[in-house]
């Protein structure tokens, strides 16, 4: 098998071919009981990568105004990858949380605040002890408005880090969302099904300044 550099995202030419069939998942969210795929009228969609998706998904499903969440893969090349394939570093995907939310209750700006304040966005291709391109920090945007807000929030958080004495450069990528592929069902709402399971999520003690 070809050796893979786990500090660089693989290119499309060398990525695994994947498959045409999608990974089956439960139709209903194990916590909220809502559809895992349907987006009701008036709801919005967002995608965030914060390292291992187990803890990140729980963080978002706990927020008032979040209708449903899902763990999955995005940002890479391989269609309908398996968890094992993503962990091999040969798909280009990050572990991503899909968030369906009610903007009348929780804004995209508030979701960005949750994103920045609850992981380390300056670690490159890792998050704590989890090492590999699948653990990179990312915001995958769906609209020009989301893109603008994401970039501005990154600038504010970078300034806040510097003010706090952290001179590292944020490595979080902000790009237009590519196709999202659902992870296997045992990864969905993992920390609800396994309350004492692994969670490597943790912030750096810096708050996102308000958007003024």
From Swiss-Prot:
Chain segments annotated as coiled-coil in the UniProt record: none
GO terms under biological process: cellular response to oxidative stress; protein modification process
Pfam families from the UniProt entry: PMSR (PF01625)
Reaction it catalyzes: L-methionyl-[protein] + [thioredoxin]-disulfide + H2O = L-methionyl-(S)-S-oxide-[protein] + [thioredoxin]-dithiol; [thioredoxin]-disulfide + L-methionine + H2O = L-methionine (S)-S-oxide + [thioredoxin]-dithiol
Catalytic residues, chain numbering: 52
Cellular component annotations (GO), alphabetically ordered: cytoplasm
EC number: 1.8.4.11
Disulfide bond entries: none
GO molecular function: L-methionine-(S)-S-oxide reductase activity; peptide-methionine (S)-S-oxide reductase activity
Key words, A-Z: Oxidoreductase
Family: Belongs to the MsrA Met sulfoxide reductase family.
Biological role: Has an important function as a repair enzyme for proteins that have been inactivated by oxidation. Catalyzes the reversible oxidation-reduction of methionine sulfoxide in proteins to methionine.
PANTHER family: MITOCHONDRIAL PEPTIDE METHIONINE SULFOXIDE REDUCTASE
Protein name: Peptide methionine sulfoxide reductase MsrA
């Amino acid at each position: 098998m070809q050796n893979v550099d786990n500090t660089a995202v693989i290119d499309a030419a060398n990525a695994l071919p994947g498959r045409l069939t999608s990974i089956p998942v439960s139709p209903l969210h194990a916590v909220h009981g809502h559809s895992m795929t349907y987006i009701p009228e008036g709801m919005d969609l967002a995608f965030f990568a914060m390292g291992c998706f187990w803890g990140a998904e729980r963080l978002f499903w706990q927020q008032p105004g979040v209708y449903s969440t899902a763990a999955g893969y995005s940002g890479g090349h391989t269609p309908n990858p398996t968890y094992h394939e993503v962990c091999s570093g040969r798909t280009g995907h990050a572990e991503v949380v899909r968030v369906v939310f009610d903007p009348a209750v929780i804004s995209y700006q508030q979701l960005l605040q949750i994103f920045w304040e609850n992981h380390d966005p300056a670690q490159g291709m890792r998050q704590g002890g989890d090492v590999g391109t699948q653990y990179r920090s990312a915001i995958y945007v769906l609209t020009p408005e989301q893109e603008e807000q994401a970039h501005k929030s990154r600038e504010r958080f970078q300034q806040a880090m510097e003010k706090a004495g952290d001179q590292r450069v944020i490595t979080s990528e902000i790009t237009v969302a590519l196709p999202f592929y659902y992870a296997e069902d045992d990864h969905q709402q993992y920390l609800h099904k396994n309350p004492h399971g692994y969670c490597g999520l943790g912030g750096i003690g810096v708050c996102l300044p308000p958007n003024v």
